[in-house]
C-alpha cells in the first residue's frame, strides 16, 4: 500500500515537499521545491514534534527515537531525521530530491505528524568538529518549517 505525505514550509524559506513510500521497509522518496534560500548548502531535517506554535523552535530536536549521534544520510549511526543538505543555486526554487532508506511513513517511527526544518547553514553531517556537530550538524538557524501531513494517494 503506497503512502504519501506533504509538508508546506513557511518562514523565511517557503515551499512544498512531498513524501512517498511504496510499502513498509522500502525507501522514501522526498521531492519538492523551496524558495528563499541563500546560495549554498542548507541542513534539511525531520524534527521530533509537529508543533509550530512558537515557529520552528517548538519542533524540538531532530527525530531520534534510538538515541544515536547526528550523522550523514548514508551513516548507520544517525538520527532518523537526518536528511543531510539541500543545495540552493541562489535562484528560486531550490529542488529537493532525496531517497532515504531510514525514514518511514509507516508504524511507530513514521515521520507523519513531525516537522521538516530547513536551516540557514550547511549540515556538517556530524564531521565538523564543532560542539554542535554531533547533535545538530551545526546547521544554524531554523529558517523554514512545516508539519508533515497525510496526502491523498
Swiss-Prot record:
Keyword presence, Zinc: yes
Gene3D superfamilies to which the protein is assigned, alphabetical: Superoxide dismutase, copper/zinc binding domain (2.60.40.200)
Keyword entries, A-Z: Antioxidant, Copper, Cytoplasm, Disulfide bond, Metal-binding, Oxidoreductase, Phosphoprotein, Zinc
Sequence positions bearing Phosphoserine: 59
Amino-acid positions noted as binding Cu cation in the UniProt annotation, renumbered to this chain: 45, 47, 62, 119
Entry GO CC: cytoplasm; mitochondrial intermembrane space; peroxisome
GO molecular function per UniProt: copper ion binding; protein homodimerization activity; superoxide dismutase activity
Residues modified as Phosphothreonine: 53
Subunit composition and interactions: Homodimer.
Family the UniProt entry places it in: Belongs to the Cu-Zn superoxide dismutase family.
Name used for this protein in its record: Superoxide dismutase [Cu-Zn]
The species this protein was found in: Drosophila melanogaster (Fruit fly)
Amino acid at each position: 500500500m503506497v503512502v504519501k505525505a506533504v509538508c508546506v514550509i513557511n518562514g523565511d524559506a517557503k515551499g512544498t515537499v512531498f513524501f512517498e513510500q511504496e510499502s513498509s521497509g522500502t525507501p522514501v522518496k522526498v521531492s519538492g521545491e523551496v524558495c528563499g534560500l541563500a546560495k549554498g548548502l542548507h541542513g534539511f531535517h525531520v524534527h521530533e514534534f509537529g508543533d509550530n506554535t512558537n515557529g520552528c523552535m517548538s519542533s524540538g530536536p531532530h527525530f531520534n527515537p534510538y538515541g544515536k549521534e547526528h550523522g550523514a544520510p548514508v551513516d548507520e549511526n544517525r538520527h532518523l531525521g537526518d536528511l543531510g543538505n539541500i543545495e540552493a543555486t541562489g535562484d528560486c526554487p531550490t529542488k529537493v530530491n532525496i531517497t532515504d532508506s531510514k525514514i518511514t511513513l509507516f508504524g511507530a517511527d513514521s515521520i507523519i505528524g513531525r516537522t521538516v526544518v530547513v536551516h540557514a547553514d550547511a549540515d556538517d553531517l556530524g564531521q565538523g568538529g564543532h560542539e554542535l556537530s554531533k547533535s545538530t550538524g551545526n546547521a544554524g538557524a531554523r529558517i523554514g518549517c512545516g508539519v508533515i501531513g497525510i496526502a491523498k494517494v
